Amino acid sequence: MAISERASRILYGIEFVIFALIPICALAAWALFYGAGSILMFLFALMMLVSSNDSASLLEALRNLAIFAAIVALTGMGLIAIWKFLRLSAAFGNHGSKALQELRETYWRCLAWAALPLLATTALFPYADPDFSGGLLLFSGVTLCVPLFHLWLELRYRGNQG
């Protein structure tokens, strides 16, 4: 039993509001505040690396540089993934499966950009506050899998029908 494209788009809109809106806002805020701060800390760690004299401070500066570089990279990848996901959602919501088919390559790139930040946030967020780890599931990006799966189904099955 197949549902109409109009019903599928309405269902996707509901899925987007329930499962994607909170994580996108939370991840964008996290990227804005934590990512921007990490850029500053990365620059500070770079200055520490340049001015370190002994091996202990050099190792500490290298460690800090690596940590903040990883945070900046994950933040950038997450922002790119969010942008691509919003682009795909707008295309499907406004123009349906035909527009989504034209952006098939963007869908797979979105998944590639999102994989590492999604794994990192899923693995690290529960350790941030063990008392609230269940609630952090809503903010970690795991719930984005529901609308992404819907888009994949649209690409796979409605795209093959023409």
Please place each PLM-identified region on the residue numbering.
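Hydrophobic alpha-helical transmembrane segments of integral membrane proteins
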Residues: 19-20, 113-114, 143-144
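Cytosolic juxtamembrane helix at the C-terminal end of the final transmembrane segment
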Residues: 82-102, 106, 130-162
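Short membrane-interface loop/juxtamembrane segments of multi-pass integral membrane proteins
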Residues: 52-62, 91-117
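Juxtamembrane "helix-exit" motif on the non-cytosolic side of transmembrane helices
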Residues: 119-132
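Small-residue packing motifs within transmembrane alpha-helices
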Residues: 9-11, 65-77, 85, 110, ...
